[in-house]
From Swiss-Prot:
Membrane protein topology class: Multi-pass membrane protein
Pfam families: Oxidored_q2
BP GO terms, sorted: ATP synthesis coupled electron transport
PANTHER family listed in its UniProt record: NADH-UBIQUINONE OXIDOREDUCTASE CHAIN 4L, NADH-UBIQUINONE OXIDOREDUCTASE SUBUNIT ND4L
GO terms assigned for molecular function: NADH dehydrogenase (ubiquinone) activity
Name of the protein in question: NADH-ubiquinone oxidoreductase chain 4L
Keywords from the named record: Electron transport, Membrane, Mitochondrion, Mitochondrion inner membrane, NAD, Respiratory chain, Translocase, Transmembrane, Transmembrane helix, Transport, Ubiquinone
Cellular compartment(s): Mitochondrion inner membrane
Gene: MT-ND4L
Similarity section: Belongs to the complex I subunit 4L family.
Function per UniProt: Core subunit of the mitochondrial membrane respiratory chain NADH dehydrogenase (Complex I) which catalyzes electron transfer from NADH through the respiratory chain, using ubiquinone as an electron acceptor. Part of the enzyme membrane arm which is embedded in the lipid bilayer and involved in proton translocation.
EC number: 7.1.1.2
Length: 98
């Protein structure tokens, strides 16, 4: 395993641990999800370039589009929750009230 793959795997793991540990605030959870998607994008791009797989060259772009959609939906949900309740604590959100 090369140093680049280890760094990307470490970035993904740190983002996953951050998502599991700091899930009380919605903003920190969204930042950790973005870190996970960015490391997946870089790892997928490097893998496709290394094995010269031209048929799957659009796959990282599709992943990046899904990451952008996830970020837009997450930020709009964060704005809605923070204007409605005045905080971004995930524990205080009840699905029965929304």
């Amino acid at each position: 395993m090369s140093l680049t793959y280890m760094n990307m795997f470490l970035a993904f793991t740190i983002s996953l641990v951050g998502l599991l540990m700091y899930r009380s605030h919605m903003m920190s959870a969204l930042l950790c999800l973005e870190g996970m998607m960015l490391s997946l994008f870089v790892m997928m791009t490097i893998t496709i370039l290394n094995i010269h797989l031209t048929l799957a060259s659009m796959t990282p772009i599709i992943l990046l589009v899904f990451a952008a959609c996830e970020a837009a939906l997450g930020l709009s949900l964060l704005v809605m929750v923070s204007t409605t309740y005045g905080m971004d604590y995930v524990q205080n959100l009840n699905l029965l009230q929304c």
